[in-house]
Regions:
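Ala/Thr-enriched low-complexity intrinsically disordered regions
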Residues: 4, 17, 21, 27-30, ...
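A generic alpha-helix propensity feature with a strong bias for hydrophobic helices
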Residues: 10, 17-21, 176, 180
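Coil-to-alpha-helix initiation sites in intrinsically disordered, low-complexity, charged segments
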Residues: 21-22, 51
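Binding-site signature for planar aromatic cofactors or substrates
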Residues: 30-233
C-alpha cells in the first residue's frame, strides 16, 4: 500500500518524505478500491467461464436422454480420404469427467477407415432457442467387439439392433430403396457390424449470439485441467 506520511518544512510548509508517494489518502483509497474491483471482476469472470463449461457438459448429457434436445443430433466433421467431410450423428453419451462424447456406427461404413487414418474430429452443436453454438475438437477411437461395444449393445433397444443386420454395407449401390431396409435378422450377425465411436475432447469453443452483442469463450485441455479464456466473437 502507498504510504501517506508527510514531513514538515520550515515555515509550516509540508514536504514529501524521502521514498514517499505524492498521492493523498483519498487517491490511495481509490487505488485500493480499484484493485479490489479488478480482482473481484477477475474472480467473477473465472466463475462465469467455469459455469459455461459446466453447463455445456450438462447440456450435452441432457441431449443423450432427450430426443427433442437441439444437441441430440450433432454434425461431426472429419478430414476424409478425399478432403473434409461432415455428417449428422446421434449423440449416445457425454461424460464430463472423462471428457468424452460417443456415437455409434456400422463397422462397414466408409467413415471408419477415415477415423483410423486420421482420428481428429470436430463436433458441432447449435441451440436455436438460446442461440448457443458449441464446437468440440478431439480424436476418435473405434471400438469393435470389445467391452465398450458389448455394454452399448446390451443397452440398445431391440428395434435399433436390426439396423446393423442389413446385408449390403452402408454406401453400397442397390437397385431398389427397399433393399436398404433392415430386416429382423440374426442378432449375432448384427452385432458383428456394430461399432462405437469414442471421442476424447481436448478443445471447446462456445459462442452465444445476442441481439446487441455476442459472447465467446474457449476451453483448452492442458492435461490436468481446462484453460479458460474469453475471446472476441
Amino acid at each position: 500500500m502507498f504510504s501517506t506520511r508527510l514531513s514538515h518544512r520550515r515555515g509550516g510548509n509540508l514536504r514529501q518524505a524521502p521514498g514517499e508517494t505524492k498521492f493523498g489518502r483519498g487517491a490511495l483509497l481509490a487505488f485500493e478500491r480499484l484493485g479490489f474491483a479488478v480482482d473481484l471482476a477477475k474472480r467473477m469472470s473465472s466463475d462465469e467461464l467455469q459455469n459455461i463449461l459446466d453447463k455445456t457438459w450438462s447440456g450435452l448429457a441432457k441431449a443423450v436422454d432427450q430426443v427433442n434436445h437441439p444437441w441430440r443430433f450433432p454434425a461431426l466433421g472429419t478430414q476424409g480420404l478425399d478432403g473434409p467431410n461432415v455428417r449428422t450423428m446421434v449423440l449416445r453419451s457425454a461424460d464430463a469427467a472423462a471428457r468424452q462424447l460417443t456415437a455409434q456406427t456400422d463397422i462397414r461404413s466408409a467413415k471408419v477407415s477415415v477415423f483410423r487414418k486420421d482420428p481428429r474430429v470436430a463436433w458441432y452443436f447449435f441451440d436455436p432457442q438460446t442461440k448457443v453454438q458449441v464446437r468440440a475438437h478431439g480424436s476418435v477411437t473405434v471400438h469393435h467387439d470389445n467391452e465398450v461395444t458389448r455394454a452399448a449393445w446390451a443397452a440398445m433397444p431391440e428395434a435399433n439392433k436390426h439396423n446393423y443386420a442389413m446385408p449390403p454395407a452402408p454406401g453400397s449401390p442397390i437397385d431398389d430403396p427397399s433393399l436398404g431396409q433392415a430386416p429382423a435378422g440374426d442378432e449375432a450377425a448384427a452385432y458383428a457390424n456394430f461399432a462405437v465411436l469414442s471421442s476424447g475432447i481436448t478443445f471447446i469453443d462456445w459462442l452465444q449470439l445476442g441481439d446487441e452483442w455476442h459472447r465467446r469463450a474457449q476451453f483448452t485441455w492442458t492435461g490436468g485441467d481446462w484453460r479458460r479464456a474469453w475471446v472476441a466473437p
